[in-house]
UniProtKB/Swiss-Prot annotation:
Pfam families: Bestrophin (PF01062). Residues 445-461 have a biased composition (Basic and acidic residues). Keywords: Cell membrane, Chloride, Chloride channel, Ion channel, Ion transport, Membrane, Transmembrane, Transmembrane helix, Transport. It is found in: Cell membrane. Residues 49-95, 252-274 are extracellular. Forms oligomers. One of its GO terms (molecular function) is chloride channel activity. This is Bestrophin homolog 17. The chain crosses the membrane at residues 28-48, 96-116, 231-251, 275-295. Residues 462-474 have a biased composition (Polar residues). GO terms for cellular component: chloride channel complex; plasma membrane. Belongs to the anion channel-forming bestrophin (TC 1.A.46) family. Calcium-sensitive chloride channel subfamily. It comes from Caenorhabditis elegans.
């Protein structure tokens, strides 16, 4: 039976924590006590042999071995291996829990989409639910020992009422042709739904598709559990983890002994009980036991899934939905919530609820009567979004740096210093407040151009169509001429 302890941790009261530690079923104490008892037997056997049976020479050799192994215990990365292993096993355990199928979705779909009140309608609904649960039983018999013990043979399934004798005969005849017959009850349920659709018990094709889809989802969930059981974690992984943990504490039988010689290796305290090693044993072995339990959640441990209870609940709830309570609903009357003066009701001992409010909802930065000045902000004047500036700002700074290098190489005065702005910058980057009369890029024309400016890597002059480099080259040609 799954151990429920949610009530014990319903609050942070320290006494509730003590109640949680006091649990026995499924607890760390129950998992570790047997291993700890065996380990202590071996520990004290070596303890008495070392102190009372060994000679001085053997004691010296034993102490050297103890010191050597104790210094190298860190070579076994137990925390690393157990951490990854438990995480992997827990993810598989959670996946198996999430796909565990319940009958409600199938039963509600069948009850709504096959709404007839006749005897054939009623028997069809009940048979579909029974076949779906029978499919679940056949799967659980092969992957769960608890269900296998409940139904050792298919004859027990017939005696429990989940299957009739003639249905068992058909199932056994199919079993001679196929090794697995999980699909047979699902095929029966689909065939019943098809016949109901052909006889107009299920009117619309979309309704028929919805019934088939609900049955399919149940079958897919059971197929996932079959894969979970048939394809486990590669066996080498749990082997190396379980072996490493047990080898570690086997070495501790020697390395954690209290030494009594006069050597420098003599321990400062001589305790008869290795308290710290026992605590380490409880925590590490308990951690490993968690992984062992989670490896097969369909087993027979205290914390494994209650699959027999799931089967019983599925058949009882499914039949209640499609038959016992089918088509019934209470009379329509006005409810108390329609009263505008209605207030939520709580028992006298219950806790008053707290509404969900934002963390800054009750912060008052201004009174309702305060006059708050609204300032219009131009997005173009906003500072960069980070200390390093935007990508455009960094790219523009890089182009300005290249321009300064080009100006210095030509020994010319920087036009940006002369005109107070740079023609390569877009209009949005210009400071319009300090340069109201300066033209922007959109309004720059020949009459507004500076006396000399850059276009690419050449300096042009507005006085003539030739660049200064071209004029200087022509002058040198005239002189040579």
């Amino acid at each position: 039976m799954t151990v429920s302890y949610q009530l014990d941790v319903s609050s942070g009261n320290p006494l509730l924590f003590l109640r949680l530690l006091g649990r026995w079923r499924g607890s760390i104490w129950k998992s570790v006590v047997g291993d700890l008892f065996v380990w202590l037997l071996f520990y004290y056997a070596i303890y008495f042999a070392y102190r009372y049976a060994f000679s001085k020479q053997l004691q010296t050799v034993f102490e050297e071995i103890s010191i050597h192994t104790d210094d190298r215990m860190k070579y076994l990365p137990l925390t690393f291996m157990l951490g990854f292993f438990v995480t992997t096993v827990f993810e598989r355990w959670r996946s198996a829990l999430n796909v565990m199928p319940f009958i409600e979705s199938v039963a509600l779909s069948v009850a709504v989409l096959l709404p007839g009140k006749g005897r054939e309608d009623r028997l069809t609904r009940r048979a579909i639910i029974r076949y779906v649960v029978l499919h679940q039983i056949l799967v659980f018999r092969d992957i769960s020992m608890r269900v296998r013990r409940r139904f050792p043979t298919l004859k027990y399934v017939v005696d429990a009422g989940f299957m009739r004798q003639e249905e068992l005969d058909v199932l056994e005849s199919v079993n001679q042709e196929s090794s697995q017959t999980y699909w047979v009850p699902i095929n029966w349920a689909n065939s019943l739904a098809l016949v109901a659709h052909q006889q107009k018990l299920i009117d619309q094709p979309t309704a028929f598709n919805n019934v088939i889809f609900a049955i399919k989802e149940f079958r897919v969930a059971m197929e996932t559990l079959i894969k979970f059981d048939a394809i486990p974690i590669p066996i080498a992984y749990p082997q190396v983890v379980f072996l490493a943990v047990r080898v570690y504490f086997a070495i501790c039988l020697v390395s954690r002994q209290f030494l009594i010689s006069d050597m420098k290796s003599k321990t400062q305290m001589d305790w008869p009980v290795p308290i710290m090693t026992v605590l380490e044993f409880i925590f590490v072995i308990g951690w490993m036991k968690v992984a062992e339990v989670l490896l097969n959640p369909l087993g027979e441990d205290d914390d494994d899934f209650e699959v027999n209870s799931i089967i019983d609940n599925n058949i009882s709830r499914g039949m209640a939905i499609v038959d016992t309570t089918h088509g019934y609903h209470p009379d329509l009357v006005d409810d108390v919530f329609s009263d505008p003066n209605y207030l939520p009701a709580y028992s006298e001992n219950s806790q008053i609820p707290r509404n969900l409010t934002g963390s800054a909802a009750k912060v008052e930065l201004a009174a309702p009567t305060d006059e708050v000045k609204i300032v219009r902000v131009n997005p173009e004047d906003a500072p960069p979004t980070s200390e390093r500036g935007s990508m455009f700002t960094r790219r523009n700074a890089y182009s300005l740096r290249n321009r300064k290098i080009s100006i210095a190489s030509n020994n010319l005065e920087s036009p940006s210093q002369e005109r107070k702005f740079n023609l390569s910058m877009p209009a949005g980057m210009l400071n319009k407040s300090t340069q109201p009369d300066r033209p922007t890029m959109e309004t720059v024309s020949e009459e507004h151009e500076p006396s000399h400016f850059y276009r690419g890597d050449r300096v042009h002059s507005s006085d003539s169509g030739l660049s200064k480099t071209q004029q200087s080259s022509e002058e040198s040609v005239d002189k040579k001429g």
